[in-house]
Amino acid sequence: MTALLDATDAQMATLADLVDALQVAEATLSSMSAARDGLLAIAGRLAIDLAKQGNHPDRGDHSLRTVAAEIGAVQRVSDRTIERRMAAAELLVDQFPAVWAAQGAGRISPAHSRVIVDAGSGIESPSD
């Protein structure tokens, strides 16, 4: 990069520190996103457990929407948005645990996880 040819040693050191700090910040954000996905997956399982406890004529849809509405209220998003997030989180956590773990460790971003899940969702297991 020719733009850095005129940079002083102090400026280069500052840039290196900024890059390192941003890398740590990104890894932390990825880790926190994985933690949120884990919590959303648990919330989805809770909704299913609640639905199974009774003989619901809506087959548990009300339980799912109620759990999603509770979460959505504090996150300031709709229950449908939370339902989608819970479904995506359950898929990531249950079907792609190594990807979820890599994201949790900050080795990959949530965007990387989505691409892997999207690409891998259509692949059938050899045992199927």
Ranges and model annotations:
Residues 1-128:
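Peripheral, non-cofactor segments flanking catalytic/redox cores
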